[in-house]
Amino acid sequence: MKSSRFHPEAIVFGISIALLATTTTIAAAQAVATTEANKVAAAIQEEKRLEALALQAEVKKVSRLDELAATREQLSPLELKELLSLVGFEGKALKEAWAIVMKESTGRPKSHNGNANTGDNSYGLFQINMIGGLGEDRREKFDLKQNSDLWNPVLNAQIAYHMSQGGADWGSWGIGPNAYNGGKAGSYYKWLDQYPEGK
């Protein structure tokens, strides 16, 4: 029978191996955690960068809208297209909105038709009619202090965007199935053909 001898070196060696394995596992876990933390930090940085870019774009948009609002004589065809796009019109609705403005005011923000015989007291780019009770309702609905507020081209276009449901219903301008005049559009189609595509 062999006598068992106590070998402290073997125990120390075993403990050292176990500690080394544990240290390696901890180091690997720390490396994974560091990598994940770096990924999260990078994602947060990217999100902040995108938010900053979106904010810069919004500031530029507001600044450009302010510039266009200061225009009082006549918007060029491209300025008009830009303004309508900035307030939300897009695609087919943008083209239709552009043609309607050209038909109604030829891009002149201070246009006014005060001919009560034709049922008009219409203002601005889209010639928004403010005659009689219609004016009272619209002043209240759109928080207008006076009809001449509609000479602001941005405000006028924003109200037209709302009235037309984003360009889906041009009935108030005599275009389409909901038109007050049965859809006779007159010069609308002439202007539609002159829309500045791709510019």
Listing of model-derived features with the role each one plays in the protein:
Residues 66-71, 82-88, 112-116, 142-153:
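Second-shell loop/turn segments in exported
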